[in-house]
Amino acid sequence: VRFIFQPAEEETGGALDMINEGVLKNVDTAVGLHVDPETETGKITVKDGEFFASPDFFNAEIIGKGSHGAQPQNAVDPIKILTEILFNIHKNVDSATENEVVMSVCKVNSGFSENSIPDTASFGGTVRAFDNVLRKKADIAIEETIKTACEKAGAKYEYKYTYLYPPLINDKNVTELLIKSAEKAVGKENILTAEKNMLGDDF
């Protein structure tokens, strides 16, 4: 039995680095344990099949033309363009994926002063899905939303979608074995069935 303490389950991804260091040499089966503040102490939640979603990221920059705030007619205002994108992006992604993914815009940045329209505006976020086809559909829908708004306003854009890890899908046989073992340790009454969720983990 080998205990492994993995860092960075999202974003940079600690699992691959540990594998490359040889941590899984001569290992037949790996079982992950994730701390959950919503689970009561002494209880274990477990689920076979789909459990954690793929945690993809996206980032975009809208490239317009700055101007003095008193002369907006001389600008290609990236903030106005970004506002339109943010208004449409959720409904476009939901429509393209039939409401089967979670997409959240988590950061928005633009401007430095109160009287100057900036040249650029940027935003980024995450897409969570249990299906690789839906991941691609979300990617396309996000870029199409950006492209449409920028072309209409005469702006340019840069866009990057980062495909991180596939969904975490637990093996049924290993899950059943884990449940039997856990029952001996904490009692059958303390083994709960977990719900699949949109968190991510590269385990």
What would you call each of these model-derived segments?
Residues 1-107, 111-118, 201:
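Histidine/acidic-residue-rich, glycine-tolerant segments that coordinate divalent metal ions
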Residues 80-203:
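Metal-dependent amide/peptide-bond hydrolase catalytic core
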